[in-house]
């Protein structure tokens, strides 16, 4: 299990309360997962921190929605986080949630395809399949790697993406779900 400092746990608990409050009006997470929020959402997001060697980086989280994993990783110490979310209501929530973190959090209310930005690491959770993700981020420069939280169809997604893209990848087991995987993708290039 992960060792998490008390100060971070306290901030994550505040974040959890905020998500639950806002979820009643803008559906940030599935109602079926609210009862198990800490395991299903907080730990699922927080586990990515073990694959981030240097926290003094710029991380971009696409399709941020409820701030998972972006806000959680910012609270856990990632120095600069940009959250890209097209839904204005969710951006208003993200603005409130970003105040919980001591680090630099930028909210970008645009479609991912329109955003031009450079980062060290790109994350997303419950967003889309690999092909769609890779197509959406054509204007985002990812210097180091992608950390993508995936479910049971991860192998199919890899096979399908390999038909259009060249990339290296590692598969890590999720600590929160047997079917869950973390895809660590690097050196992404579109085939000609």
From Swiss-Prot:
Classification via Pfam families: GidB
The EC number(s) this enzyme carries: 2.1.1.170
Locations listed in the record: Cytoplasm
Keywords annotated in UniProt: Cytoplasm, Methyltransferase, rRNA processing, S-adenosyl-L-methionine, Transferase
Function: Specifically methylates the N7 position of guanine in position 527 of 16S rRNA.
Database matches in PANTHER family: S-ADENOSYL-L-METHIONINE-DEPENDENT METHYLTRANSFERASES SUPERFAMILY PROTEIN
Family note: Belongs to the methyltransferase superfamily. RNA methyltransferase RsmG family.
UniProt protein name: Ribosomal RNA small subunit methyltransferase G
Protein species of origin: Rickettsia rickettsii (strain Iowa)
Taxonomic lineage from the root: Bacteria, Pseudomonadati, Pseudomonadota, Alphaproteobacteria, Rickettsiales
């Amino acid at each position: 299990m992960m060792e998490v400092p008390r100060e971070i746990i306290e901030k994550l608990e505040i974040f959890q309360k905020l998500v639950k409050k806002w979820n009643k009006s803008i559906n940030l997470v599935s109602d079926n997962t609210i009862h198990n929020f800490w395991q299903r959402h907080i730990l699922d997001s927080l586990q990515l921190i073990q694959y981030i060697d240097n926290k003094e980086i710029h991380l971009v989280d696409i399709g941020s929605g409820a701030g998972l994993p972006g806000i959680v990783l910012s609270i856990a110490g990632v120095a600069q986080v940009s959250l890209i979310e097209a839904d204005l209501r969710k951006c208003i929530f993200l603005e409130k949630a970003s105040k919980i973190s001591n680090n630099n959090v930028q909210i970008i209310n645009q479609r991912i395809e329109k955003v031009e930005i450079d980062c060290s690491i790109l994350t997303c959770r419950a967003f889309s399949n690999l092909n769609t993700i890779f197509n959406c981020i054509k204007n985002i420069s990812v210097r180091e790697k992608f950390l993508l939280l995936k479910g049971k169809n991860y192998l199919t997604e890899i096979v399908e993406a390999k038909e259009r893209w060249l990339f290296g990848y590692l598969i890590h087991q999720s600590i929160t779900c047997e079917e869950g995987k973390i895809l660590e993708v690097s050196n992404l290039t579109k085939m000609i």
